[in-house]
Amino acid sequence: ISQSTGHTLQTEALAPGSEAPKGAITLGLDPAIGNREGYVLTVKADRVTLNGQTENGVFYGIQTLRKSIPAETKATSILLPAGSIQDEPRFSYRGMHLDVGRHFFPIEFVKKYIDLLALHNMNTFHWHLTEDQGWRIEIKKYPKLTEIGAWRDRTVIGRNTEEYDNTRYGGFYTQEQAKEIVKYAEERYITVIPEVDLPGHMLAALAAYPEMGCTGGPYEVCPRWGVFEDVLCIGNEKSMQFLEDVMAEIIDIFPSKYIHIGGDEAPRTRWKKCPKCQARIRTEKLKADKNHTAEDR
């Protein structure tokens, strides 16, 4: 509210059963509200009352109150229409996705993005951290992921025009910065779900550690867009260990219930010709069909 009005509101706790002074905005918890993220916002001539079943609900009600105030009003007094809003989410999962793999965004932009999610009562931030075009999260056991994988030498101009800007581009987040984002989101009742896309979309990782690909490379951090045949070698024990190690560090950074692992656009071209992959397929009796993935259909 202070962002919209320029006024910093004083806050104080009310004793149970006491009445707030006239002109106050009163926040409270009401277990009778049916949805844990629901709230009731009531505007009367002399006061505003906002109750939620949980702190989450109160927070979402505050966002509605914020949006009732004219943007950047900086007014000394604000008129709100009298009435009551009883609101609750239709969907328990409400999120948006940010791809920082293809295009890197600095941490301050990520925070602003989270602020906008909060303003619109979103509760999940899907953070797409790895791509063919860049690896964006520090993994301490594999430093080349950010030393090499976070940077591409050039970027295609437009939609795969075969013209390039010949400008080095990239960036990454340290683990401390990622934890800072998790905390920032948590303070706004938003869960961060990280995505490490695999086994496809891994050219940035293969550029850093070419031994994890079926051909052994050389690979480059991809400067263009599309779906590419070089994916993680599933028959290589180093690849399996890599995945375990990376996920162990990701889990330590992100306390979310879910970790997204992509799974899209992974051509099996290399696997079909790779002796190691074919050996694993036979040993573990792995099977698929032509309708196994959208890319095969």
Predicted regions mapped to residue ranges:
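Active-site mouth loops of central-metabolism enzymes
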Residues: 95-109, 230-238
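Contiguous, structured surface segment used for ligand recognition
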Residues: 1-93
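Hydrophobic faces of well-ordered beta-strands that scaffold small-molecule active sites
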Residues: 94-98, 125-127, 185, 192-196, ...
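Active-site beta-loop-alpha junctions enriched in small/polar residues
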Residues: 101, 130-134, 197-201, 264-268
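Aromatic- and acidic-residue-enriched carbohydrate-binding clefts of CAZyme catalytic domains
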Residues: 133-187, 202-241, 270-296
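A conserved hydrophobic secondary-structure block that centers on an alpha-helix together
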Residues: 99-132
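Conserved, mostly hydrophobic/aromatic
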Residues: 1, 54, 96, 117, ...
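Active-site groove signature of glycoside hydrolases
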Residues: 198, 217, 228, 243-270
